[in-house]
Structure formats: C-alpha cells, structure tokens
C-alpha cells in the first residue's frame, strides 16, 4: 500500500491488527458522536489564504516548558502501545526523539519507564491517572523523576471509564473475550509474529513494577476499573504539585472555568481534550471548546490540545484556535501499528510538510504568526457556535 497521507495509515492498521486492538484505539464512547465531531468540527475550520508574502524564511520551531520543539507537536499518552508494535513505546519514543519533539509515556504502557527513558536522548514526558491507590501514584512519580522525565501530564477526565460499546463487540471485553482475542491473533500473522511472539512480555510494565508480578491484559482491565477514583478534587492534587518539581500539565479540560481553576492551582499547562471521544459522548469537540478556553487563560498558562488531529493542516487549525502545542494520539498509533518507528517517523515528516504548506499559503512565517486572524468563515456556512465569534469580520 502506498502511504501518501496520514489517513492512509488507518486503513493499513486495520488490515494488520486483530479487530480487538484496532477497535480499541479507533472507537469511542457510546454512539461515538463526540468522536466524529472531533474530526468534523476541525475540518470545518477554514483558513484565510494570503499571497505574495515572501515565505522563504519559514520556521515551525517553538518552545514549551523551556524545551525546544522542532514543531508544535508532541506524541500524547496512549495506553498499550506495545500491543500495536513490538515494544511500541520504545519505537514511538525514538521516532519523536529523532524529530525533535516530546514523547509522553502512558501510565498503562507495555514498556515500563525504565525501558523507554534510556532509549532516547530527550527527556520524555510521563502521564499519570488519578487512582485510588495513592501508593502506585507515588511510586510512579518517584520512578519518573529518577528516569529524568521532564513534564508530568496529569489526566483528570477519567474518574470513571467511559462506556465503549465497540470493545464488547470486538473482543477487548465481553463474553469469551480471551478466546475471541486468541482466534483473532492467529488469523493476523503479521501482528502475531511481530508483536504476539516477538514483542513479549505483554504485561503492563509500570503496574507490574509496582505490584511485583506480571500484569496481563485481563489483570489490567480489572485493576484499572477498580482504581479509578470518582471522589477526586483539586485538593487531592496538592500533594502531587508539591512532590513534582517539574512542569505539570492538567489533561482533560473542556470548560473555561476549569481552565481558570488550573491556573489558580498552579499548573503549568492544560490539555483541551475530551479523551478522543472515549469518555463522555455528547460533549464539545476540542475544536469547539478551545476558543473560549483560550480567551479565558491565554498567556496565563500553556494551552495544549488533542482529539481529532489527523494531519498537519489540523495542527495549524488548532494553533489558530488558540493552542500553543498539540498532542497526537490515534494518528501516530495508526502509523506505529503499520510500520513501527519508521511509520511514526514518516507520519511526523508528513505532518511537518503539511504544516509548511498551510503556513506558506496563509502567510504565517512562524508559529506565533498563526493566530485567530488566520481563520475565516466557511463559505456560506456558519462555523460551530463556539468558533463563530472568531470569524467575525473575516468572512470570505
């Protein structure tokens, strides 16, 4: 298959992966309305084309938390990467490192902190959930600090897991799930050889290191379900702010007031995110939520965004809507499942090229020049309500 665009990786990954793994990453919560809106709303954001601007000196470089980034993109935290490619977290981290952008290791990664951190030169970021087991949280934070992780991404939009109906149909959960997964694995030989046989161990490395025993997929599902903490509040995060002396980012913000609370709390950054449409179906897409949040806290805190970003044009759109940097999720996982480190490296090259084209044709020579003024109204059609104020006066 010829890969000429980031979207090609999704089709390739679907052919390679057992259905339980493909649909686990591809699916969303309930009827997947928000999952679809994430992509559709972003696609409706029209950019303002400008000409004759002498774009010979164009730069994608930016700085975030005193780190230089080759472009305003980071690989976000995605669980179970090591089930999508052989030691997948290591491969993805190496691709990000080579491109000059951060990699974020998930709490529920296959490869533990101690395996991924030494594989790259750049300090990685570490993502942590709010869990009932505070001992695990402290253990993970201590290990992340010892490994030199620079930034903590604290996910707060999972006090309880979302209802993901696709998982029951595909075999990730539901009746006879283990047998269904086995039958799918043996009928997908490329994955079975690369990951099933040669990608072992398949336990959840960070959890296993804490529990002192291997933690497989069934253990992971049970342990995680029992450890989400619906009682969490801002006060419960104070000990983490005191313990972690590096940048701390709160992930899962969709409301301006929550963004203001993050500023008051002392966070260094927020991620405008609905968890890729995997938590509460029917909430705002990130593209719709972002402008109001940017109006509320831009300049007071770093604003990152994810959910629905599939290519370099989407990155430029998110920056124009108010983000400082974006996180990739499904987009890089599709590429990882298709071609490992080389796939992620190629995806990042594609995104960089697409960003350069978009910036050249909108007259933005640097990331700081991608602003609300880069946006226009979609031809003859109102933008989604949350975006409409930004287009005022710029109708094409």
Swiss-Prot record:
A cellular component annotation (GO) from this entry: plasma membrane
Broad EC category: oxidoreductase
Residues binding FMN: 106, 127, 155, 251, 306-330
Extent of the signal sequence: none
InterPro entries: Aldolase_TIM, Alpha-hydoxy_acid_DH_FMN, FMN-dep_DH, FMN_HAD, FMN_hydac_DH_AS, LldD
Pfam families listed in its UniProt record: FMN_dh
UniProt membrane topology term: Peripheral membrane protein
Protein location: Cell inner membrane
Cofactor: FMN
Positions of the catalytic residues: 275
Keywords: Cell inner membrane, Cell membrane, Flavoprotein, FMN, Membrane, Oxidoreductase
Domain FMN hydroxy acid dehydrogenase: from-to ranges: 1-380
GO biological process: aerobic respiration; lactate metabolic process
GO molecular function ontology, one term from the record: FMN binding
E.C. no: 1.1.-.-
Reactions listed under catalytic activity: (S)-lactate + A = pyruvate + AH2
Binding, substrate: 24, 129, 164, 278
Function: Catalyzes the conversion of L-lactate to pyruvate. Is coupled to the respiratory chain.
Family that this chain belongs to: Belongs to the FMN-dependent alpha-hydroxy acid dehydrogenase family.
Protein name: L-lactate dehydrogenase
Species: Escherichia coli O1:K1 / APEC
